Every structure is written in C-alpha cells, then in structure tokens.
A protein has these predicted regions:
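Beta-strand/loop substructures that line and gate deep hydrophobic ligand-binding cavities in soluble
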Residues: 77-102
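Short polybasic/polar patches that bind polyanions
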Residues: 22, 39, 99
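Short secondary-structure transition/capping segments
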Residues: 72-85, 120-128
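Terminal, regulation- and interaction-focused segments at domain boundaries
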Residues: 1-26
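Well-ordered alpha/beta subsegment
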Residues: 100-128
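Compact, glycine-rich, soluble single-domain proteins
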Residues: 29-78
Length: 128
C-alpha cells in the first residue's frame, strides 16, 4: 500500500481526484463516505472516503488471465484524515498485487501504477 500526504482536506482532495478522472474520461463506479456511514449508526470516524474507478478494457484483460484478481478491481483510492488532522491518500502497489496473481509480466500493470501515482500526485498537489 502506498500512502501519500495531501495538502488539502479530504473533501477537496476527493473532488480533485474526481475532476482528474473526468478529464481523463475514466469512469467512476462508486464513491464511499465511511464517515457518513459511521454517523448513520451512531459512531464517530475521522473523514474517510474511497473512490472506485477504472477502465473495463484494462480490467477485463487482467481478469481473463486470472479471474481471482477481480477482488482487487476496479482501482481504488482512499482519502482519509488521521487523528492529528493530517490528510492522506492510500492506493495499491500494483506490482506487488500483480505478483500475488501471477500477473507481474502483464505490461498494463506498470501503466496502472503510473496512473494511480499521477492521479494522487495531482490531487494532493505533490506533482513530481
């Protein structure tokens, strides 16, 4: 798992992620607000959101090679606030994940990692 600090709030970071995905024509399949869900059952949680997105063209090819990777797809980025009020993004290490499924030689894995890093760097204002 990769963790990277954001200069913005959870809501602003998530909004920036959504804008980037929209500009790249990458579909968003779901968004979860864990803090909101916790409040609905009377529990407290620091801001914590997850966005689920990806390209069926890419994911399908991986699942054709090993259907078990479907548990990892579509791609996800979590944006959360720690107990000190610092905001973080978390996203998978695709190369490690791919090796668990025998897919480390698939060229798309590196591209998926680059995409995740690009989205996170731009949304957190940590452009490299």
């Amino acid at each position: 798992m990769n963790n990277q600090a954001s200069k913005f709030s959870v809501d602003e970071t998530m909004g920036r992620i959504e804008q980037i995905l929209q500009k790249m024509d990458i579909p968003v399949f779901a968004k979860f607000d864990h803090q909101k869900n916790a409040k609905e059952v009377g529990l407290d949680l620091h801001p914590n959101q997850v966005i689920v997105f990806g390209s069926p063209k890419v994911g399908t090819k991986l699942m054709q090679e090993n259907p078990a990777i479907s548990i990892e797809l579509p791609l996800k980025i979590s944006v959360w606030e720690d107990k000190n009020g610092k905001v973080w993004t978390s996203f998978p290490q695709m190369e490690r994940l791919a090796s668990e499924y025998g897919l480390e030689k698939e060229p798309v894995i590196g591209k998926m990692q680059e995409l995740l890093e690009k989205i996170v760097n731009q949304s957190t204002d940590n452009n490299k």
